[in-house]
Amino acid sequence: NELQEAVKASCKAEKGTIADNDSLNVVYIIGESFIKYHTNLYGYPLLTTPRLTKEKAKGNLYIFNDVVSAYAATSLTIRNTFCCNSLMDKEKWYHTPFFPAIFKRAGFDVYYWDNQKTDVTEGLTGFTTNSFLYNKTIASLSYTASSDKTFRYDDQLIQDYFKNKKPTGKYNLIMFHLWGQHIDAASRYPHN
């Protein structure tokens, strides 16, 4: 079964090393249904992402211009994004390690805050979110901590992370899985 293969591949992940005289915080955001052509970060004339624009101006945000998801479905994209396989070389996601496990073995603290976590285990999305990302073995190999609840708004999820799990180590991988543009814009932010 694919999930068992993914667990085996992640268990075999090589232990990496990191320099003792440096520190690094990597923030990985799964934005969900983000349409780059509707954001001024990619040249859209309206200021639709003012906070991201400020972060870019401060040098805190790198904009990728040549990345395209291989799939239009979250479940397939997440499995192939979180594993180290090459789709170009026709490698299967479950034959390669889960990249957060590699970071953790290298000495990083790894945090995963997910606003789409659900108790549903049926269907394609349920399989991805629960059976894969929250498999007990993969989770113990990969996460220092993960969120145990979801929020109405994405900014509440991020606030919860910084309130409850500020990074304490020198090396941190912080991952946020947001609702993003999956839901109606009027429902994405508080009206105040």
Where are each of the predicted segments found?
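Active-site-proximal alpha/beta segments of enzymes that process anionic O-linked groups
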Residues: 1-28, 33-192
